[in-house]
Amino acid sequence: TVLEMMAEFEQTQSAHDGGFWNANNFVYEEWIEENLQAEAGLNIPENWVPAIQLLSFDVAGQALGFLNLRLRLNDYLLENGGHIGYSIRPSERGKGYAKESLRQGLQVAKGKNIKRALVTCSTENPASRAVILANGGVYEDVRNGTERYWIDVD
């Protein structure tokens, strides 16, 4: 389930880029509602932008990961986060799921008229770099330890 995946991220203290929640006061139904509102740009924190929260599952229905598609960039996202943040649960990494998740996220971006998507990763994350490059990422530069890549979505 999604809750089991969230618990795995918490237990392993693994980064869950593309998935945001408050573990202390978590209520699943409220999380769903907050994500629906965020897509419409409603009740989002200051300096956040409208975003679509996506989840990935395997064929058996096991939750695999998160992908957050920001529908526009602000100054912070232009420097650090980009249009898309993603992560795969720790027990399922190294199986190609991140590559497919990003591919599908880019298709959603295309449907939202995003022509070029900025996708970033830490200079310390070669696996994410490989995922971005496999999806057509073109390196632009590094800023504060964050590699920045542009992907033509058309």
Language-model features, listed with the residues they occupy:
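Conserved beta-strand-loop-alpha-helix junction that forms the acyl-donor binding cleft
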Residues: 119-129
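Conserved GNAT acetyl-CoA-binding A-motif
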Residues: 109-120
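Conserved acetyl-CoA-binding loop-helix of GNAT-fold acetyltransferases
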Residues: 85-88, 94-111, 129-134
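Loop/helix-junction capping segments adjacent to catalytic residues or to phosphate/diphosphate-binding pockets
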Residues: 78, 95, 126
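Conserved catalytic-core motifs of GNAT/GCN5-like acyltransferases
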Residues: 120, 133-151
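GNAT-family acyltransferases
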Residues: 1-83, 108, 144-154
